[in-house]
Amino acid sequence: MSIQVEHPAGGYKKLFETVEELSSPLTAHVTGRIPLWLTGSLLRCGPGLFEVGSEPFYHLFDGQALLHKFDFKEGHVTYHRRFIRTDAYVRAMTEKRIVITEFGTCAFPDPCKNIFSRFFSYFRGVEVTDNALVNVYPVGEDYYACTETNFITKINPETLETIKQVDLCNYVSVNGATAHPHIENDGTVYNIGNCFGKNFSIAYNIVKIPPLQADKEDPISKSEIVVQFPCSDRFKPSYVHSFGLTPNYIVFVETPVKINLFKFLSSWSLWGANYMDCFESNETMGVWLHIADKKRKKYLNNKYRTSPFNLFHHINTYEDNGFLIVDLCCWKGFEFVYNYLYLANLRENWEEVKKNARKAPQPEVRRYVLPLNIDKADTGKNLVTLPNTTATAILCSDETIWLEPEVLFSGPRQAFEFPQINYQKYCGKPYTYAYGLGLNHFVPDRLCKLNVKTKETWVWQEPDSYPSEPIFVSHPDALEEDDGVVLSVVVSPGAGQKPAYLLILNAKDLSEVARAEVEINIPVTFHGLFKKS
């Protein structure tokens, strides 16, 4: 998996080009044979509009949200896409300029207003974006597109029409929520977001949304906070993108990438700033791992620590004989990886892309093992007694537990990211296989499968082809964990190729089963799901 491929033609730049939405679905040209059991829709979110008029967006997470759908029926495939009608998008289209500040792009007051109107507009408070470009997930019978703020957007998964905006603050105490909730098999949704806790200090709340009940009321209206995690810094919450969940425990990893709330509230309101301006790194903090008892709704005061890293995606978490196994896609060090995801960097020529990536934190897939039963008499000892891991947990004299990981995969500037597993059957349980998007100096150029027990890897890769996050779909009669297919949207700007296609791989060995080609470009997508018919 560590074989490095070069991209001198710069075809990856097509990932960051504005496209138009479609008025109706396109029929894709299929080569190979799509399994007849594969019936349903692949839904994906990402940016599709990278500028408004003459005003560009600057960061990868700024472009306006585009919702994509590949429909599978009786071996045929259609492709559809529509922009999500968020407030950010509608107002930008109406005023023909960027109206709401995005992750790395500031919105400025209407230049047509006089100086007094512009001055007072800064004191209206922080106007938070609802640009739902990151993920889509189910709540009850409904589907929501989301970013990482308090706003989520209800969409119609059949027509891709936007239905309404929902403010989570109207139901629970969170300032925002991640785009990676956990969905249990009964439909229960868990998520995490920071909040103001006791004495106005910052904390992190776990939100639970129940499954749809017999009364058919919106489950979001029945949301509740089930447990609260403390924050290591009273006024500077860590950036959190995902978390771990097992049948009995919740795992939260607190990294040194911090949000400076004073800067967020003051500079944003007074003279204009964006989200990226408000991040800073605590160079001395390292990483703290927190756990809570899910069933008893209780925070457990075990103090797990380790050396600094960035974290965006948990792979899986499970229980094993008194231990929690936590598998993560890490980036070494305390510097924020998002500093390297400005569009200007990603659109550079290949040699410059590599040069920039060499300065960034380096990726590594790691396994941490957290002992649940701590005996103070074991100070100085390794508490990990499992026979199948090299990870350690040393009980220190200050009663903290210092963790060292087992490395599952590591390659220089070769990341295994956007991980997926056989989620429905193995989330929170012992598992063997993970699927990931391979990033080559931040350029997505391969799909990977990792055996987390043996560290064996499989790779799909073709020249001038730029895939997306792999989505695993289990065979309806599966007998083994990896019985099924992997779906990925591939951008293919090379000569003699269609601009983009939906790739279907055998999940066993990543051999190609089929592809469904379309005659139009598809920009980068981040996350999504397969909705079975």
UniProtKB/Swiss-Prot annotation:
Q: Changing residue 91 to Q does what?
A: In LCA2; severely decreased retinol isomerase activity
What are its cofactors? Fe(2+)
Which branch of life, at top level? Eukaryota
What result is annotated for mutating residue 106 to A?
Answer: No loss of enzymatic activity. No effect on palmitoylation. No loss of membrane association
Whether Cell membrane counts among this entry's keywords is yes
Q: In which tissues is it expressed?
A: Retina (at protein level). Retinal pigment epithelium specific.
Q: What is its EC number?
A: 3.1.1.64, 5.3.3.22
Effect upon mutating residue 469 to A: Decreasing protein levels. Loss of enzymatic activity
The listed outcome for residue 101 to I is:
In LCA2; severely decreased retinol isomerase activity
Give any Gene Ontology cellular component.
plasma membrane
Assembly and interaction partners: Interacts with MYO7A; this mediates light-dependent intracellular transport of RPE65.
What is the purpose of this protein? Critical isomerohydrolase in the retinoid cycle involved in regeneration of 11-cis-retinal, the chromophore of rod and cone opsins. Catalyzes the cleavage and isomerization of all-trans-retinyl fatty acid esters to 11-cis-retinol which is further oxidized by 11-cis retinol dehydrogenase to 11-cis-retinal for use as visual chromophore. Essential for the production of 11-cis retinal for both rod and cone photoreceptors. Also capable of catalyzing the isomerization of lutein to meso-zeaxanthin an eye-specific carotenoid.
Name the protein family. Belongs to the carotenoid oxygenase family.
Connected disease = Leber congenital amaurosis 2: A severe dystrophy of the retina, typically becoming evident in the first years of life. Visual function is usually poor and often accompanied by nystagmus, sluggish or near-absent pupillary responses, photophobia, high hyperopia and keratoconus.
Name of this chain's protein? Retinoid isomerohydrolase
